[in-house]
């Protein structure tokens, strides 16, 4: 079973894809535009995304490029009515992993999804171990004492950055830049809120506070 993010502005097609995928045993989040897609991506951490190019608020290729620039690594399958070879090159160059041209059969979508997941799972696992903490870079998961902690994409990005810099202070500005490449979206208090939630989740598995706020400098991950 996979958690699939479907990003499609056509309501009938979006519903059809959602139902077919659910009938095949998958969990599905269905977004009608890029803004909603970003929400599901950050909150539900999907395994794979199916993205239509003609979204009302942002071009699908732009959305994929933005995800890739923010180190979002999940496989992306594009739905497109564009059949020219130049269009296909543009799709793949944007950071998409594969594409299906419209009209399509749902069986082809399923087959390409499975192929992408097999390819993704075949990549060598990259893990950072600072016992009892473990970060699986390929799965974007944080474990403590071999128990996976459920994190949002933003929370995971913070923890990966702090653990990569174990024992070193990471500035708030540096974290904000990774979370929000678009300067207009950055609000300094957002990091404080995320840190509060993150500390609570970690302390439910590990009794000591491993994230220290260094006043005027940033944050420090350090085992005590």
Curated annotation (Swiss-Prot):
Domain of life (superkingdom): Bacteria
SUPFAM superfamilies linked: CheY-like
One GO MF term: phosphorelay response regulator activity
GO process terms (BP): regulation of DNA-templated transcription
Keyword Cytoplasm recorded: yes
Protein name stated in the entry: Virulence transcriptional regulatory protein PhoP
Subcellular location: Cytoplasm
Record-listed 4-aspartylphosphate modification sites: 52
Start and end residues of each Response regulatory domain: 3-117
Organism: Salmonella typhi
Stored PROSITE patterns: OMPR_PHOB, RESPONSE_REGULATORY
Regions recorded as binding DNA: 125-223
Classification via InterPro entries: CheY-like_superfamily, OmpR/PhoB-type_DNA-bd, Sig_transdc_resp-reg_receiver, WalR-like, WH-like_DNA-bd_sf
Function: Member of the two-component regulatory system PhoQ/PhoP which regulates the expression of genes involved in virulence and resistance to host defense antimicrobial peptides. Promotes intramacrophage survival of S.typhi. Is required to enhance bacterial resistance to bile in the human intestinal cells.
């Amino acid at each position: 079973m996979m958690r699939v993010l479907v990003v499609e502005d056509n309501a009938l097609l979006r519903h059809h894809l959602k139902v077919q995928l659910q009938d095949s045993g998958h969990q599905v989040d269905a977004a009608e535009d890029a803004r909603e897609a970003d929400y599901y991506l950050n909150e539900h951490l999907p395994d794979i995304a199916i993205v239509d190019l003609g979204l009302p608020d942002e071009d699908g290729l732009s959305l994929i490029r933005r995800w890739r620039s923010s180190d979002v690594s999940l496989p992306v399958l594009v739905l497109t009515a564009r059949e020219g070879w130049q269009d296909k090159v543009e799709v793949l160059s944007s950071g998409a992993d594969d594409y299906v041209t419209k009209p399509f059969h749902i069986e082809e979508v399923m087959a390409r999804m499975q192929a992408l997941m097999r390819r993704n799972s075949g990549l060598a696992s990259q893990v950072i171990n600072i016992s009892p903490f473990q970060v699986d870079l390929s799965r974007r998961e944080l474990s403590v004492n071999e128990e996976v902690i459920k994190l949002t994409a933003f929370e995971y990005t913070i923890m990966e950055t702090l653990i990569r810099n174990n024992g070193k202070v990471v500035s708030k500005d540096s974290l904000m830049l990774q979370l929000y490449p678009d300067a207009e979206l950055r609000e300094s208090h957002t990091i404080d809120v995320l840190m509060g939630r993150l500390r609570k989740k970690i302390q439910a598995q590990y009794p000591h506070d491993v994230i220290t706020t260094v006043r005027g400098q940033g944050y420090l991950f350090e085992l005590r």
